[in-house]
């Protein structure tokens, strides 16, 4: 497939293995990625992970601020196929209609489940027991195009958004490379999505990062691990946001209101829920580093926490 002219559109680290494999196996004409960002107090310019790979391999980089208004440079390259993965903007019809083999998207869910920008987080938060990768044709909708191929992974109880991210990134490469030849020679499957089965995974809002203990232990467990390692779940104690990075479900039940801190020992910070309690195993105080429960106990007094209530 070395003569296959490809434009790749993507932004985060999830896409890096895909781009690296495409560079090895095809002729990548250009990479389209999100504009550079200023980060930190010094407002230093940060390149996307995909841009870094493109620069390393001397590949043309395009970074439209609004792709629906700035697509002529992309079309002028006359690609055979455009492959996207977590690009970050809605791709206009002018681009979708450009390549002879179409625009193909690598989406991190088993469509039509979890359409949208945060399928990895929401798969865990919403309690799914499996998810996967879907290779699909793009259309003008949000992840609504015809499906070509899928690969499935199980979501384990010890998975976090980070570990599931890595699992899905790893299986996306062989799935795409297995599927590409059939797309080129026209023998690929093409299955329409059933909109009645669709669920949505919109980007995580600030409100969704907040842990309300007025939920079941399982829901809180899923929320905390589904936001680890980015952006992180938090709860409010004494007016301060405390990051909660990991917990386990505890079978003990109490009469105290949900969110009440029952105990602090080597097993964790025990907090009541609507149907029992959870043990917080890893947390982070404002301005401090992430701590496991052992380090937290060494630097904090039990009496300062027990009896208080998370908001």
Task: Annotate the PLM regions.
Residues 221-311:
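C-terminal active-site/capping subdomain that shapes the small-molecule cofactor and substrate pocket
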């Amino acid at each position: 497939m070395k003569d296959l002219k490809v434009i790749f559109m993507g932004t985060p680290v999830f896409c890096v293995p895909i781009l690296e494999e495409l560079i090895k196996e095809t002729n990548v004409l250009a990479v389209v990625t999100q504009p550079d960002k200023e980060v930190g107090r010094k407002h230093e310019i940060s390149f996307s992970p995909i841009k870094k790979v493109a620069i390393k391999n001397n590949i043309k980089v395009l970074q439209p601020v609004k792709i629906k208004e700035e697509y002529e440079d992309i079309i002028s390259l006359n690609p055979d196929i455009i492959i996207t993965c977590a690009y970050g903007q809605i791709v206009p019809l002018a681009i979708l209609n450009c390549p002879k083999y179409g625009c193909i998207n690598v989406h991190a869910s088993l469509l039509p489940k979890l359409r949208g920008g945060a399928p990895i987080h929401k798969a865990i938060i919403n309690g799914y027991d499996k998810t996967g990768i879907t290779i699909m044709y793009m259309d003008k909708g949000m992840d609504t195009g015809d499906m070509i191929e899928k690969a499935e992974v199980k979501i384990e109880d010890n998975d976090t958004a980070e570990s599931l991210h890595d699992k899905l990134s790893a299986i996306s490469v062989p799935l795409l490379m297995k599927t590409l030849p059939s797309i080129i020679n026209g023998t690929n499957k093409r299955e329409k999505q059933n909109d009645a089965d669709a669920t949505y995974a919109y980007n995580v809002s600030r409100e969704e990062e907040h842990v309300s203990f007025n939920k079941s232990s399982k829901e809180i467990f899923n929320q905390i691990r589904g936001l680890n390692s980015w952006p992180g779940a938090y709860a409010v104690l004494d007016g301060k946001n405390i990051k909660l990075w990991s917990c386990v479900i505890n079978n003990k039940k109490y009469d105290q209101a949900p969110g009440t801190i029952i105990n602090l020992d080597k097993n964790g910070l025990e907090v009541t829920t609507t149907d029992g309690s959870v043990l917080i195993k890893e947390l982070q105080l404002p301005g401090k580093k992430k701590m496991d429960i052992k380090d937290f106990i060494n630097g904090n007094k039990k009496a300062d926490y027990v009896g208080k209530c998370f908001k």
